Amino acid sequence: MRVLAAMSGGVDSAVAAARAVAAGHDVVGVHLALSTAPGALRTGSRGCCSKEDAGDARRAADVLGIPFYVWDFADRFKEDVIDDFVASYAAGETPNPCLRCNEKIKFTALADRAVALGFDAVATGHYARLEDGVLRRAVDADKDQSYVLGVLTADQLSRAMFPIGDTPKEQIREEAAERGLAVANKPDSHDICFIPTGDTRAFLGARIGVRPGSVVDADSGEVLAAHDGVHGFTIGQRKGLGVEGPAGDGRPRYVTAIEPETGTVRVGSAKNLDVWAISAQRAIWTSGQAPEGPVECMVQVRAHGGLAQAVAEAVDDGTSGGGISISLREPLTGVAKGQAVVLYRPDSELGDQVLGSGTISGTESEPNTL
């Protein structure tokens, strides 16, 4: 089988490529150039797409004895990931750019080019397991990345390979060292690759500008402070609110609601954050077909954490793919519009199975009667 190995310059993708070679596949390595602007992406050990990372990927390919190329996807990345990220925050949402990159860049733009060039699959260094079209959590629970892959369709999964999902991270590093890969001890990348400073608020402010609004007490309606734009806030945020002192009950204040139409950011105590029901749109089902009737499942709303028992049901909401109505058996906090909600079928033996996902469009704070 002809396999295109996406090589970020890190240890995970290098070992994924090595395993594809060891499995007897005809492997070609490729690094995605996602920006041409100096300093636009993180560099060194904290990045995944910098010139230094491209060099590390090339050296790993040389060790493996496979052809290697750098492909320019900068324009597509800006349009589908960066611009989408900015627009979502301007609308008071909280997007995850890693999901969008997987959905639009790695497993659409890259995969489409791979197929056009005669490749059968794209291999990446994601920590997840995929067998017969079924996507499951990785063996290494701490490194599991099935959440950021939950946006992939059945067709996209049919062209994907995740060679390292059955192995703990430390063993991957040991294997890299045994294979003579210089990236064996390279630190993991963190944060958002296209925000070099790590200051998301400043990054967004430079692109959205000042859109004044008010910070309002969620219970009393009292205006507590002014702000420069809703893009500086996310649900559950505690720091940087521009408000002195605790909430009326003496406890810390959190962002509990964002209203982009009026520029209002509501803050209150933690009790205002509980969510018992979630509405999601643009549903994606990994099997290619929506389930019939209610489904008992676990839902996850963040890459790390935000997990709860639930009952989910596909609904016709007029959006592409339809919607998902989710009733929680226990409350979640910090649930924001724009986040992805990923549904899992628990399986302690084989690993939790990803059923599908949707983009959160609304929440309800009243307990349900399941």
UniProtKB/Swiss-Prot annotation:
Q: Which domain of life is it from?
A: Bacteria
Gene Ontology molecular functions? ATP binding; tRNA binding; tRNA-uridine 2-sulfurtransferase activity
Cross-referenced CDD domains, in alphabetical order?
A: MnmA_TRMU-like (cd01998)
Could you name the active-site residues?
101 (nucleophile), 193 (cysteine persulfide intermediate)
Reactions catalysed, semicolon-separated, are: S-sulfanyl-L-cysteinyl-[protein] + uridine(34) in tRNA + AH2 + ATP = 2-thiouridine(34) in tRNA + L-cysteinyl-[protein] + A + AMP + diphosphate + H(+)
InterPro entries listed in its UniProt record: MnmA-like, MnmA-like_C, MnmA-like_central, MnmA-like_central_sf, Rossmann-like_a/b/a_fold
**Compartments where found:** Cytoplasm
| A GO cellular component annotation in the UniProt record | cytoplasm
Alphabetical UniProt keywords? ATP-binding, Cytoplasm, Disulfide bond, Nucleotide-binding, RNA-binding, Transferase, tRNA processing, tRNA-binding
Q: Which cysteines are joined by disulfide bonds?
A: 101-193
State its Enzyme Commission number(s): 2.8.1.13
Q: State where ATP binds.
A: 6-13, 32, 125
The UniProt entry, under Pfam families, shows: tRNA_Me_trans, tRNA_Me_trans_C, tRNA_Me_trans_M
Query: Might you name a Gene Ontology BP term for this protein?
Result: tRNA wobble position uridine thiolation
- Site entry (Interaction with tRNA), positions: 126, 339
| Region listing for Interaction with tRNA, in residue ranges | 143-145
Described purpose of this protein according to its UniProt entry: Catalyzes the 2-thiolation of uridine at the wobble position (U34) of tRNA, leading to the formation of s(2)U34.
Entry similarity comment: Belongs to the MnmA/TRMU family.
| NCBIfam families named among the record's database cross-references | PRK00143.1 (NF001138), trmU (TIGR00420)
Name of protein:
tRNA-specific 2-thiouridylase MnmA
- Classification of source organism: Bacteria, Bacillati, Actinomycetota, Actinomycetes, Mycobacteriales
Gene from which this protein is expressed: mnmA
